[in-house]
Amino acid sequence: MAVDNLNVLRDGYQAFASGNMARLGELLADDIVWHTPGDNPLSGDYRGKDAVLTLFGRLFEETGGTFRADVHDLLANDDHGIGLVTVTARRGDRTLTVNDVNVFHLRDGKVAECWIASTDQQTEDKFWA
């Protein structure tokens, strides 16, 4: 592996957890595509680094800074990575706790594409509605 993609993912999750969007931006390809599933106001395909960072900002804004993605495990090879995470957040009187699988395509040491797969999309949709 020319670039240690496992460390790229680890650094990305640490930057996200600490709110370090500048560092996180360094780990995203300029032409990244981020696929957020579901039927809620945050669902959709986000194209470009600025769009993805704006999405991340909304996650924190909508939850009063309580949004977390706690990593259970990370796996990576030369081209792909997987993050097994538990997502937790609060929004008013609503709480969210759900397990997600984040599948990454990495290119030149940066995240080029990500697909989020929820184990309970209906619960996530209700939370973000």
What are these model-predicted stretches?
Residues 45, 93-96, 122-128:
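A short, polar/proline- and glycine-enriched secondary-structure boundary/capping micro-motif
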Residues 78-87:
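A short hydrophobic beta-strand element
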Residues 103-125:
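Short beta-strand edge/turn micro-motifs at domain boundaries
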Residues 16, 90-92, 113:
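Ligand-binding pocket scaffold of soluble enzyme catalytic domains
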Residues 29-78:
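A solvent-exposed, acidic/Ser-Thr-rich amphipathic alpha-helical stretch
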Residues 69-74, 87-88, 99-105, 115:
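Hydrophobic/aromatic beta-strand elements that line small-molecule binding cavities or substrate pockets
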Residues 1-30, 125-129:
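Short, low-complexity N-terminal intrinsically disordered segments enriched in polar/charged residues
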Residues 28, 87-89, 118:
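Short beta-strand segments enriched in hydrophobic/aromatic residues
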